[in-house]
Regions:
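Metal-dependent amide/peptide-bond hydrolase catalytic core
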Residues: 42-45, 261-533
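Divalent metal-coordination and catalytic microenvironments
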Residues: 72, 113, 124, 157, ...
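Sec/Tat-exported extracytoplasmic proteins
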Residues: 61-62, 69, 73-76, 97, ...
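Histidine/acidic-residue-rich, glycine-tolerant segments that coordinate divalent metal ions
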Residues: 144-152, 158-159, 175-295, 305, ...
């Protein structure tokens, strides 16, 4: 006898009819039991009339989301230079009746869109910056550059900004129709890839009236995160020396590049003596202009990561001393330039459970066989040979146990947000299995139908979760109490950028904004937002 697994059911391929009937009976019992039992300690939420309104609105306006995400994909822009991306989201929200204030926290491409009045205030994060040098043709399962040196949406922020905005509008529609009191805010946060936007939102007190903030990120899995992230510090070290002819009078010069190299050597020896979970990364944006000139100027750029910010700070403080030593050895002048810094993300158990209950209620994205055909060549290009090629399940977290600090992975600027207001983070499978972030495969897929379908699904997760928070003040009270207790146990949070100036575009990207190649020349027509009124 041979068994095959098909979805949630077991099918027999051989055997008598009585055995097949018995199999169907026990399979049905198993499915009923699974549906009746809590998943990962959380029961599926309840579909209320308010949630039905939001879900129906999102289904009806799915095309607007796809058009907006497509517009942003075709206009990829680096952090703090996301003028078209920010503008199209602002236009979308204005068309839907939101009040929009731009230039938030001193950033031209930042904004806050608000609707409603009074408490509670539920916020949603939106991101829309692209990554440098990731230009890639849409839907092509092989590397194919569109514009050499142009940015590309390798982290799916064209989806992030769009479907966060769609969720905010859906919440507003439900609040209007059902007379719900309170305020919904969409935080347009630029420059996430360099960990700037939300860090400086926290510094400037932008979240001071928020009761909870919801967020999400595109990826290869469906989940409601109950995990932390690595803390990080982002800084440059500039060395100033003295130019001279490198052949005829090298003794008259003082090499800034020598100082950079000596600092890097010292940092590499340091690695043995820091915690193994730490990460020390660097590149040299400027190492001189010509070999026959003693470099009078050179700079090195460092990212320092660790499970907790206090560990990061220890390494950064040591790094400054290494830099000072390099300057002494080369008789150059050292300049330490902080850019930004973030703590580790602080999960909130109360909100994670509410979020996951609503994710279970809505379900995973309704992918079809056609979606699988779209995803398959991308998974195969990454040696993922077995389907399904789009995730059909939720990632498991044990929401009843205390979380652990991260020991690997990346860093996020909304980590700082999570220490000042309760947060929950969602993810949906916008990408084929095996797709790494920040890759050409990711860029190529972030404009395809499966990504749009997953985007609408996560909008439903966030809308349903927000409506639960509006309906039950006790949830917000408990989430805030948990945040206070977490700060007392793991903090208190000290803003790592409180004495740091907002970085310039050139400081972050080592190029002037006008020098960044453009993918779409001229003005691409905006999506039709008339149906949002």
């Amino acid at each position: 006898m041979r068994w095959r697994h098909s979805g949630s059911f077991l099918r027999m391929t051989e055997g008598g009819s009585r055995m097949r009937k018995a199999c169907r009976f026990w399979a049905l019992i198993m499915v009923v039991a699974l549906l009746a039992s809590p998943a990962f300690g959380v029961e599926a939420g309840t579909m209320t009339p308010e949630k039905e309104t939001a879900v129906k609105w999102l289904d009806t306006h799915a095309a607007v989301g796809a058009e907006t995400a497509t517009y942003i994909w075709h206009n990829p822009e680096l952090g703090l230079g996301e003028h078209k991306s920010s503008a199209v989201l602002q236009e979308m929200l204005k068309a839907a009746g939101f009040k929009v204030e731009s230039g938030t926290a001193g950033m031209k491409t930042a904004f806050v869109a608000s609707w409603g009045e009074g408490k509670p205030v539920i916020g949603i994060h939106a991101e829309y910056d692209a990554l440098p040098g990731l230009s890639q043709a849409a839907g092509v399962a092989e590397e194919k550059i569109l514009v050499e040196g142009c940015p590309g949406h390798g982290c799916g922020h064209n989806l992030f900004g769009t479907y966060s905005s769609m969720a905010a509008i859906a919440i507003k529609k439900a609040m209007e129709e059902h007379g719900i009191k309170g305020t919904v805010k969409l935080y347009g946060t630029p420059s996430e890839e360099t960990l700037v936007g939300k860090a400086f939102f926290v510094k400037e007190g932008i979240y001071k009236d928020a009761d909870a903030v919801l967020s999400w990120h595109p990826g290869t899995e469906n989940s409601v995160s109950y995990a932390s992230s690595l803390a990080m510090d982002n800084f440059k070290v500039r060395f100033h020396g003295k130019a001279s002819h490198a052949a005829s009078a090298p003794w008259a010069g003082r090499s800034a590049l020598d100082a950079v190299e000596l600092m890097n050597i010292g940092m590499n020896y340091m690695r043995e003596h820091v915690r193994p979970e730490s990460r020390i990364m660097y590149c040299i944006p400027d190492g001189g202009k010509a070999p026959n000139v003693v470099p009078p100027y050179s700079e090195v750029w460092y990212f320092i990561r660790a499970p907790q910010y206090k560990m990061v700070k220890e390494i950064v403080d040591w790094s400054k001393k290494v830099a000072e030593g390099a300057a002494l050895m080369t008789q150059t002048r050292m300049e330490f330039v902080p850019i930004t810094a973030v703590w580790q993300y602080l999960p909130n158990q109360v909100l994670a459970k509410v979020g996951f209950a609503n994710a279970l209620l809505i379900g995973i994205p309704p992918f079809t066989d056609e979606d699988e055909k779209i995803a398959e060549p991308f998974s195969r290009s990454l040696k993922e040979e077995k389907g399904p090629f789009l995730s059909r399940e939720f990632k498991e977290f044990d929401y009843d146990k205390p979380f652990s600090w991260a020991t690997g992975g990346g860093s996020i600027d909304e980590a700082n947000t999570s220490w000042v207001v309760p947060m929950v983070r969602f993810s949906t499978s916008t990408l084929a299995k095996g797709t790494p972030g920040h890759s050409w495969q990711s860029v190529a897929q972030n404009i395809l139908p499966p990504a749009f379908k997953a985007g609408i699904t996560v909008s439903k997760y966030m809308a349903a979760t927000a409506l639960d928070l509006f309906a039950d003040p006790k949830l917000l009270e408990d989430a805030k109490a948990e945040l206070k207790a977490s700060n007392e146990k793991h903090g208190p949070f000290v803003d790592p950028v409180k004495d740091v100036s907002l970085p310039t575009f050139q400081l972050m990207h080592n190029v002037e904004e006008s020098q960044v190649p453009v993918q779409t020349k001229g003005d691409m027509p905006l999506p039709d937002f008339s149906t949002l009124k």
